[in-house]
């Protein structure tokens, strides 16, 4: 159940949404007979590797960033991994590496550029994005307006929560 006006558990604030940023996971498969289209990440390799680098289940929900990415304010300390298309991520205005564990702190600003190559990047989060599962998946299906964050792409002002989990360094 979502707590109203309790922002203490929020991890990210979307300051600028980018062209198409959605919550995705492995997706809903094998439900077509019920009229449910296939959903989920499009680059399974980048998505799975991001979650593996965080030492978590392969199916933890992430943000899928299409074309140009969002600007996100960090509201609570956590770890992330950015994979997929080379979106030239910046943390507080400084270029930051992809495909590696990044510790982000409260007040940090994360931004993404237009990809140098490819079109989809993934921001995997320690614990995964906390949204409800529908038919076994947290993926957004825009066509049906279900899953993910209220069944839609992220918008400016959206507050995103992650699933609570000890930091990667504490688990080592």
What is the predicted function of each stretch?
Residues 1-169:
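Conserved "landmark" site that anchors the functional core of diverse proteins
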